[in-house]
Curated annotation (Swiss-Prot):
Organism: Arabidopsis thaliana (Mouse-ear cress)
Organism domain of life: Eukaryota
Lineage: Eukaryota, Viridiplantae, Streptophyta, Embryophyta, Tracheophyta
Protein name: Putative pentatricopeptide repeat-containing protein At1g28020
InterPro entries, sorted: Pentatricopeptide_rpt, TPR-like_helical_dom_sf
Stored Pfam families: PPR (PF01535), PPR_3 (PF13812)
Amino acid sequence: MVSSFPFVYQNMLAKRPYGAYQNVITVSMSWLKIHGSCPHRITDALHRNAQIIPVLEQWRQQGNQVNPSHVRVIIKKLRDSDQSLQALQVSEWMSKEKICNLIPEDFAARLHLIENVVGLEEAEKFFESIPKNARGDSVYTSLLNSYARSDKTLCKAEATFQKMRDLGLLLRPVPYNAMMSLYSALKNREKVEELLLEMKDNDVEADNVTVNNVLKLYSAVCDVTEMEKFLNKWEGIHGIKLEWHTTLDMAKAYLRARSSGKAMKMLRLTEQLVDQKSLKSAYDHLMKLYGEAGNREEVLRVWKLYKSKIGERDNNGYRTVIRSLLKVDDIVGAEEIYKVWESLPLEFDHRIPTMLASGYRDRGMTEKAEKLMNSKTIKDRRMNKPVTPLLEQWGDQMKPSDLKCLIKNLRDSKQFSKALQVSEWMGEKQVCNLYLEDYAARLYLTENVLGLEEAEKYFENIPENMKDYSVYVALLSSYAKSDKNLGNMVDEILREMEENNVDPDLITVNHVLKVYAAESKIQAMEMFMRRWGTEDGIKLERGTMIAMAKAYVKAGLTKKSGRGVW
């Protein structure tokens, strides 16, 4: 334990730290010689997730001095381990106890923590309290990063960036990256390219983040020519490393541009770049895209990797591989994998047999589809109610709040059929008055366990005075996930919402736009966007923007895919 402590901090410092702290935090070699020291006590406290300030106070009470560098390391360690509140407390303690004269990087770190823990408004107040002579580029960059997280604070981000420009603080790529990230989210390509030109004029070298952000933007708008030109310029330059998310987006762009050969190269590169923590997500994406590229062998190869490294106890993997095999017209392969899934004791996922049945119907195999959906196995798994006997035994003794908590816990652990059983039992036994969120939760669970058709039937039986935005969002979410053409159904739901004076919210807007985009209903998509997309609090998700861009490309409106025309 004694000898391992310094290496913990050396490994931590080897990672790229936040802001300019990378030049401030240093670990003294004398730590290697100290036994039972303050750093060792702190390490022990960190391992136990204990409070750090009492350790520091005790060290001082014993007549010892606290090294400011050690405190900065502690703050960073806490922040990196998602203990922002305690990191903020240590930062405030360092200031209150006057451990040292604070430098701009100390203020920058604290500003970031305040925004993370308390919110942007308090962070702005703290910024105003920072002495002007301590407001260096690290402080302004921290404030800029806070503003650049949302399009609601676009004006403040631009004003802060201009202030940094006026003060001559735009000497590193970090502030440029913050603005590029914001403009990319808004699909404002012109602004991103203006910033690239400004960086070039000011001799500010692009870094890894810059290159990946720009490539993702060109991928999203499907400008393969500019994407390749930019990649060729930076590929192979020291310090520039492509992220697997970037190469995956580039592969998608190539597929939309019908360059399957180039897409395949990018997908193979993605496999080389993906890290261990992201394997599950990456394999899901890879199987899907290899399927879109029409490569059955690659789908099965990645599925083999998925099983060996992730395991077979996961519905998501089976959904992805079956969908991908159907995409490459391998109905036999899809059937074989379905039989394996059917034999496993996984939570029943109606989408898997429904997907295979749809594959049968698409190929004119209607009888086979009906036989599958009416098979004893599916009926048994749908009607399996192991929770019901327990509810009959002790359910009446539970408070309504306990039952709702049970539903939430079952839902969070993806035991959807059991969660639905509890929800149905509550309704049948009338153990309490049901509220809006109860109906929304049951609608969501019904769609996940029994399918969209049953969810629609349940929706029709919900009392009109209980159909608020959460209920409508649950139904629209089901439509957005469906492979069927449901644009007309969405139109009906929107009309009903209007009659009931229920305005679309952030989630509703994104779901509706995805449905319209999936069906290439350009006019309906643009009309809905013009009406609701600019309302306060409405922000398009990246997935929504990509879906809309794909719809434009599919409709031959390539220019619109790269501009906010609505």
